[in-house]
């Protein structure tokens, strides 16, 4: 299963979250650590789901698309 996670740099390191897994967040001092940590968080999150919830997620097809906005 391919899941999109967002990893953002902040003043304390890196913050990671999965937009469609409510509450699935993690962090790390480096990008690599945040990536490892969010992967573990996703695995734990999915491990707590029921079979029908997992089936729904496996059918979910989302795209992260960059959108350019003209802002005055």
Curated annotation (Swiss-Prot):
Highest rank taxon of the organism: Bacteria
Record Pfam families: HicB_lk_antitox
Gene3D superfamilies in alphabetical order: 3.30.160.250
Family under the similarity heading: Belongs to the UPF0150 family.
Protein name per the record: UPF0150 protein jhp_0960
């Amino acid at each position: 299963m391919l899941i999109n996670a967002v990893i953002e740099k902040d003043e304390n390191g890196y913050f990671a979250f999965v937009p469609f897994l409510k509450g699935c967040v993690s962090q790390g001092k480096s990008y690599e650590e945040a990536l490892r940590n969010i992967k573990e968080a996703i695995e734990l999150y999915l491990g707590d789901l029921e079979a029908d919830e997992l089936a729904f997620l496996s059918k979910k097809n989302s795209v992260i698309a960059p959108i350019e906005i003209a802002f005055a």
